[in-house]
A protein has these predicted regions:
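Positively charged
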Residues: 1-153
């Protein structure tokens, strides 16, 4: 029996056109296994990585992965995330980005968000609230799906 070896996942860097592309939605029953595998590998290999989007690993799909609890191994995935509401309160924080190594920028973001998204099994989650650093990570990754990166501006 042959074991298929996968190539190491490469992060797309500043200047790659996929980073400025608005990603396409995942459609029902679409196979996203390879994308989920790639996102998981990136987060697992870098303890400082708190989130990554599908286009950062070369896929034009609306999928993100992130660590809901920094320092713990758990990885959360969101498919087709949509921000439905944000809090009026904002805070500033110096953000970094895997696609812009060594660059950081102070970015102001809402402290809370309400999202609709699907999990990787296709189950819909509506009106889910996120606050604090978790909300910040999710917003940063959704920016990537929309072809934007605040760190690059």
């Amino acid at each position: 029996m042959k074991t298929r070896r996968r190539k190491p996942v490469k992060i797309r860097l500043d200047g790659d056109p996929i980073l400025t592309t608005v990603c396409h939605c995942v459609i029902e029953n679409e196979d996203i296994g390879q994308i989920v595998w790639a996102l998981r590998q990136v987060i697992k290999r870098d303890i400082n990585c708190v989130g990554v989007s599908a286009n950062q690993v070369g896929y034009d799909k609306r999928i993100i992965a992130y660590r809901p609890n920094i320092g713990l191994p758990e990885i959360a995935f969101m498919v087709n995330p949509i921000i439905r509401n944000v809090t009026d309160d904002e805070d500033k924080f110096k953000e970094g980005c895997l696609s812009h190594p060594g660059r950081q920028k102070e970015i102001s973001r809402p402290t809370g968000i309400v999202l609709d998204y699907e999990d990787i099994s296709g189950k819909l989650h509506n009106g889910v609230k996120f606050n604090g650093f978790e909300a910040r990570i999710i917003q940063h990754e959704i920016d990537h799906l929309n072809g934007k990166c605040g760190v690059a501006l």
